[in-house]
Amino acid sequence: MSISYLELCDFSHDVYRQYGDLKTMTDAELECHFLTYGIAEGRIYGRVANRNDFVNLIDASGKILEIGPLDRPQFNVQSQNYYSLDVFSREQLINNYATDPHVIKENIVEPSYVIFNNDYSVIKERFNCIFSSHNIEHMPCLVSSLNNLSSVLADKGLIYLAIPDKRYCFDHFKNETNIYDVLQAYYEKNYRPRFMDVLKFLSQGTHNNPIDHWRCNHGEINSESILIQDYERLLDQYKTGVYVDAHVSFFTPESFEKIITTLNSLKLIDLKIHKIYHTLYGSFEFYVILKKVKKNG
């Protein structure tokens, strides 16, 4: 890693120096400490210390497309510049979350676009900002999904992603997604989570308390009993062709950055990392801004 990586992370010497044990360090020593220890320790190092700080980076004056807002849109849904997209209609979403006490049904947003087959050609608008919170991990084919988002992004537009860090959420025990997983999904042209993805999602989860995960209290899973309990039901459901939602990918900031960089080098996407904000202590998400570039750029 180099100074350019510090710029990618939006590193601030002044912010990082506020820690008592770092106050007397030089700029060079701060940079070394951040790269060696600070990222792993989840220290605050810049202007983004939480979700609100990240959202506040967004210029909301232009057209905005929010992916999967469910019942918690991050922007004014009444604005004429606001659009949303989901793989389910509002009615389907209400039905899907009927027994979930954490979802306020009356607040579920009516999607401007309902697209479950990766065909974004129906979208004629071009957006200055695309915002997606905890959706990228659901996308059956990361390459196709990123290209779809790029296809409706204005030339100087930006894609803002809030992504769960698999180390600190209920995905802790699942294998980290690598570039080979991503390329295989692209080769298979997956348009919905595979049966295996759904089974793993339901049977390999643990608790979702980020503080406990940061303290290395990861809980345990009982995959066998859950698998036996759900297998037949899921198989019957999957055979009907219905879209069964699941986490398909499991990222860390480092793995996601490497995947995006490799996909761009392979000329499979025309997006690059503009900024990346590492997971901070007590949180289970990191933030990424993607920008559009020429495929040979």
Protein language model regions, located:
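Charge-rich, low-complexity intrinsically disordered regions
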Residues: 1-50
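Short, charged/polar micro-motifs that form catalytic or ligand-binding hotspots
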Residues: 24, 129-140, 246-250, 277
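Class I SAM-dependent methyltransferase Rossmann-like catalytic core
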Residues: 47-59
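Structural motif
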Residues: 56-59, 122, 268
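Conserved SAM-binding loop
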Residues: 62-172, 288-294
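S-adenosyl-L-methionine-dependent methyltransferase catalytic module, highlighting the catalytic core
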Residues: 103-120, 144, 148, 158-294
